[in-house]
Amino acid sequence: SPGMGRHGETGSVFARLGVPVLQAMVTYLSQEKWEQSFEGMDSMSVGSSVFEPELDGQIITTVIGCTEKQQGEHGSVSRTVPLPAQIDLVAGLAVSWGRLQVKSASEKKVAILLHNMPPRRDMLGCAYGLDAPESACRMIRSLQEKGLFLQRSWENGAELLRELLNGLTNENDTLSYTLMREKSAGVLAGRDYEQWFTGFPEHTRKEMEERWGQAPGEWLVLDQQILIPGIQNGNLFVGIQPARETEQEAEAACHSLKRPCPHQYLGYYKWIRDVFHADIIYHVGAHGTVEWLPGKALGLSADCYPELCLRELPNVYPYIVNLPGEGTQAKRRAAAVLIGHMPPPMKQAGLYGALEELSVLLEQYRNAEKYDKKQLAILEEELQKKAEALEIPKEARVSLDGLEGWLEEIRHSQIRDGLHILGKIPVGTRMEHILEFLSTGGETREVLKERLQEIPKELDAVCATFEGRFVPPGGSGCPSRDSREVLPTGRNFYGLHPGQI
C-alpha cells in the first residue's frame, strides 16, 4: 500500500519514488448533476477519492470523469464519461510539477504571497501563529541556496516588509495616480484581461459585473491596466494577496463561497501565471482567501474561482498544523501541498488543549454535514456537552457559527510566547516554554526535544517542492494533545482520519 499516511511504519512507495502524486477523481454523479452540484462529489466517493489519498500525501486535484446511466441490452448500465477540459487541467498541473524536476534552478521563477486580510497596511503579512515576513525571508534564503536567481537579498523579514509597504499595497488612499503607477510591480493590460474574461461562463461574468462593474473594473485599475502590488527581484516575485473585498466587508467575505472577488484579484493571479511566468507559488501562513473563493466544495470545475486563479500552477502552503479544517480547504479547493509548521506555545496550555478538542468536534461536524449526515445528531450532542463543560456563554452556543466565532476570538486573545518562524528551532527560554506546552501530549521531554530538532524540515519541504519532489504526509492538530501524530512538522498534513468522521 502507499502507506495510508504512515510511511515511516509501512514504507510508502510514493516516498521512495520521491515525486509528487496527483489524485484525479471520478464521481458517480452524471455530468449534468456534477456541473450543477455545489458539493462537487458524491458522498460515496469522498472517502476513497479524497480522504485516503490525502493520508498518502497525494495532491488533490479535481473530477475528470462522471457516470452516466445508459439502457443496454440487459438493462441499465453505468458508464464513465471523461471530461476533456478537466483532464487537460490535471495533465497541465502534472506537467508543471514535472517541469520543476528538470528545469534549471537558476531559470525557475517563484512567486511568494503574503496575506493581507483585512486589506490594510497594518495587516500586511498577517498569518495565524507565524511570523510570515521573517519566514518568507528564510524561505527565500533557502531557495537562493538551491539556485534561485536573485539580484539582491533582504537581511530580515522587517526589511522585506518595509520594502513591500513602500511600494503599492492594497490600501492606497493617500497615493496619487502617478505614484500608484510608479510603485506597481507590474501591470496586466485590461484588454488581455477582458479577452480572458469573455470566456467565463455567463453566470460568472454576471455576478462579477453586478458587484465590481464591467471588466477590468476600477479596483487597482488605472487607464485600463490592472496594477500589481509586490516586488520583483530577479526570478522572484514577492506579492501581496489581493483584496477579496473592501476593508469594511472583508471579514464577512473571508469564508464566503458565494461572494465574487474583484476583477483585480483574478487579474493578479493571471499576471503571476502568464506575465511573470511563475513555475511555483507559495502562500505563506494561515490563512489566505483563494481557497475560499466561490465554486464547488470539492472536484472543482475549470470555471470555479480558485481554478481560474491557479489553473496549472503548483501551489505550496506553509500552514500551522493545529488548523486542519482550514488547511484541508486549501488542499481540496486549491490543489495545495501543505507544509505543516509548529504553532507558538500558549501560556494557558491546559485551556488551549480543551479548546482544541472542541475545535476537532466542530471539524467533525462540518465534515459530517457534507459527507455523513447520520452522525450529525451525535456530534451536536457532544458539542453542546463540551461547550457547557467549558462554560461557553449561552449566546455563543445558539449556533455553530456562533461557537466557531467565539472559538476564533478566544484563540486570538490567548497570550502567545512569540510567533513561530518557519524552520527555526526554539532556544533557551523559548525551548523551555514549548516543552512545557507539549508536555501534556504523553511524550517525555527528551523525546519531544529530539522531535523539535527536526523543525528545519519545514524549510527542507519548501526546497523539496521547488525541486518538484514529494513531501511526505503527516498528521495535524495540537501538538500538546498528540505530539506523536503531529511531530515532526514539515510534512504535508492531512485532516481527520476517515474513521473519525
Language-model features: locations:
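Ligand/cofactor-recognition surfaces for anionic moieties
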Residues: 1-501
